[in-house]
Amino acid sequence: MGQTITEKIFSEHVGREVKAGEIVECELDMIIGNDITTPISIKAFRDSGAKKLAKPDNFAIVLDHFIPAKDIASANQAKISREFAYEHNLKHFFDEKDMGIEHALLPEKGLVVPGDVIIGADSHTCTHGALGAFATGMGSTDLAYGMITGKNWFKVPPSIKVIYTGKLGEHVYGKDLILELIRRIGVDGALYKALEFTGDTIENLDMDGRFSLCNMAIEAGAKNGIIAVDEVTKAFLADKPLAREPKIHYSDEDAEYEQVIEIDVNNLEPVIAFPHLPSNGRPISEAAKMDLKVDQVFIGSCTNGRLSDIAIAAEILKGRKVARHTRMIVTPATQKILKEAEKRGYIDILIDAGAVVSNPTCGACLGGYMGILADNERCVSTTNRNFVGRMGARTSEIYLANSAVAAASAVAGKIADPREL
């Protein structure tokens, strides 16, 4: 029996053929921490008696959740990571001088390479599977173990093959592909599985869409999401100073999958996930008929804060205004994206329409700052989670959607179908 991409990546790192279900220890190619999780890892590192990082050039700290600091507590948290980075002369330390949300910034910097094994103390580390790497979120103490040893242990996950076929319709994107999958299988439908995304739809999907797709693999309970390297991947990597030599793997034709799911996208509409689970997806045509007033629209995050998302929003908002009773916040995922969006005129369009454009931050997504919801408010958001209280008040409501649905809803002041504007 052949192997899946995920099994092959582990086999290459372990030095022998491995299969799903095996417990293995292997070298890590990249360890990722942020301003929320890294201080805990640093404490565990120091408590262990360790003095040096096993692989300092394979450790990245990205201050992205509450930077610039929102209060004294977050400033002190950032200070812990900052001082540790300076103490160990970390090559890959990113703060206000080179800002970005970690799961957008690191691929942009060439620090994610096909064939890598990557861990991060953030659940959406699975985003990096879009580049043909194994990437998964772990706890802060797991991160500390990797910092000390350069290794970690894993149970090789069985794979679910998801085959998307057909052509995406108007205003249907990678976000809709993953919301539709989660709608079908639920938030635990891929528990500790590798979601391997394939099919002609994926072949024609741009990198931004692929990042969105893999980003939300965890919302189905998956250990990782992964897409095989192709010409789209290679084009994305072509101008990056890659940290390592890529090791490209493809699943064998006779690879063993726990399940195969086929999704025909030809008639797929934009999907909007109602509160309070990402699995509560409905077609936008249905939601748009419900006259659901919107208090806030948020476009950003590691899911949908990329250049194409800002371009989509600008296209819809050009010559229009955000509804009087609605506020709109746009948060580009990195400074590079922000600069390019400004260069192309997108930022002027958004501001003229009445949107607020902020620096890169995870703040709004987790209800930290820069977009907190008040009691009983309703938000259409391009983020990845809509749990109770996720973006603020426990009585608020979050509807997850793509950037076109979000922008159209900002203009209409209620949940709207962008195809009808």
UniProtKB/Swiss-Prot annotation:
Tagged with keyword Manganese: no
Origin superkingdom: Bacteria
PROSITE patterns assigned to the protein according to its UniProt record, in alphabetical order: ACONITASE_1, ACONITASE_2
Cofactor(s) in the UniProt record: [4Fe-4S] cluster
Cofactor binding: number and manner: Binds 1 [4Fe-4S] cluster per subunit.
Reaction catalyzed: (2R,3S)-3-isopropylmalate = (2S)-2-isopropylmalate
Enzyme class of the recorded protein, top EC level: lyase
GO molecular function: 3-isopropylmalate dehydratase activity; 4 iron, 4 sulfur cluster binding; metal ion binding
Gene Ontology annotations of biological process type: L-leucine biosynthetic process
Subunit structure: Heterodimer of LeuC and LeuD.
Protein name: 3-isopropylmalate dehydratase large subunit
Record gene name: leuC
